[in-house]
Curated annotation (Swiss-Prot):
Pfam families: Defensin_beta_2. This is Beta-defensin 30. Keywords: Antibiotic, Antimicrobial, Defensin, Disulfide bond, Secreted, Signal. Disulfide bonds join 35-62, 42-56, 46-63. Belongs to the beta-defensin family. It comes from Mus musculus (Mouse). It comes from the Eukaryota. Residues 1-22 form the signal peptide.
Length: 75
């Protein structure tokens, strides 16, 4: 009888799922929100000192600093 009670208590304790914050970890999100060889950042609008280079998904822009922009034409 004692082992049955112990088994039931362990089952109840192990089945408890503690509440957690939903969403991804901020460090993981920062890695996946980068673009262009981890030099750009995916945003809805670029800041003043940044320029838009490519799209990130459907709605976001890949914003790069001007010094990180690749050379498009070589003369």
């Amino acid at each position: 009888m004692g082992s049955l009670q112990l088994t039931l208590v362990l089952f109840v304790l192990l089945s408890y799922v503690p509440p957690v914050r939903s969403g991804v970890n901020m460090y993981i999100k920062r890695i996946y929100d980068t673009c262009w060889k981890l030099k750009g950042i995916c945003r809805n609008t670029c800041q003043k000192e940044e320029i838009y280079h490519i799209f990130c998904g459907i709605q976001s822009l890949c914003c790069l600093e001007k010094k990180e922009m690749p050379v498009l034409f070589v003369k």
